[in-house]
Amino acid sequence: MQDEYYMARALKLAQRGRFTTHPNPNVGCVIVKDGEIVGEGYHHRAGEPHAEVHALRMAGEKAKGATAYVTLEPCSHHGRTPPCCDALIAAGVARVVASMQDPNPQVAGRGLYRLQQAGIDVSHGLMMSEAEQLNKGFLKRMRTGFPYIQLKLGASLDGRTAMTSGESQWITSPQARRDVQRLRAQSHAILTSSATVLADDPALTVRWSELDEQTQALYPQQNLRQPIRIVIDSQNRVTPEHRIVQQPGETWFARTQEDSREWPETVRTLLIPEHKGHLDLVVLMMQLGKQQINSIWVEAGPTLAGALLQAGLVDELIVYIAPKLLGNDARGLCTMPGLEKLADAPQFKFKEIRHVGPDVCLHLVGA
């Protein structure tokens, strides 16, 4: 039970980094000696010290003979920072309990082996499912090369997202929009379409003032990280004057052809081939995985939403349902042309249902 207690503490610490560690995983570490926590820490940001280093600094000499609980296998390679294995060995830690092995090919069991070779008692697998939930994006990218995709939808009770005129602000409540801000903040990137940019001219930023108090307490304003904004723009319709281009942080355009216009330095272009007359979404996701994008939060209209669903690229659906009816002339939730058989319909299962102000949020994962 003691091991579970300390690992649960390490997992809670790891959660604090979920807004800022991309493309790295979220990791927490707790060092215990004689039944007392003598050091703890978590990974804050890529390129900065890892969780083990923060915990060892706090523990000092007390780390000798202690047990280190870490949510992910300590690294054994030289990256932006030195190997954590070396730091644990040098500190004289007697035992290391890791929640899970690191799927990164540069680590993949080598860290645990190196610790064992140094005479340290090593085990792994404790609370592994909780640790995996904390790093869904990182794990999927390492295992498949694809980012983890969350599709956000907002709809009425009858599954409508906008009036026939296109009016959609606001179907859902201010509370739902605050909830979206929190989930945006945790994402590595936000994906939308040129159609959404032309229709709504969104900023697609994280606005710290709109985060709930609990999130603000964990995520100081000075640490605010803007997710990369990715726009699918096959026909180069978005202009440098659109708001999405003028916000802090990077904006990436997925295009099928070059664009010769002048853009700010924060704008980047990814050239993606076509498939059946449309930008190839599978190739796009493969390219984003190669660019170390762990997770993508999608906010777009029914066309892109439907295309992602039909391509089998969506890992999670987050659907906000407002208690209102828009009628059969209003626009539907997603467009999926050619879907004729029930057996071909994308399948999901409910993971969580919660109230968000007057609305309901449905959280679904792939079946």
Task: Give each language-model segment a name.
Residues 140, 150-157, 161-294, 303-306:
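Active-site ligand-binding patch in enzyme domains
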Residues 310-348:
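Flexible, gly/pro- and Lys/Arg-enriched active-site loops
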Residues 337-367:
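Conserved histidine-centered catalytic loops in small-molecule metabolism enzymes
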Residues 10, 28, 75, 115, ...:
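Residue-level signal for inorganic ion chemistry
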Residues 103-106, 129-130, 198, 237-239, ...:
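Short gly/pro/ser/thr-enriched loop/turn and capping motifs at secondary-structure boundaries
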Residues 2-22, 141:
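Short, basic/aromatic recognition patches
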Residues 27-35, 153-154, 362:
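Short beta-strand scaffold segments in enzyme catalytic cores
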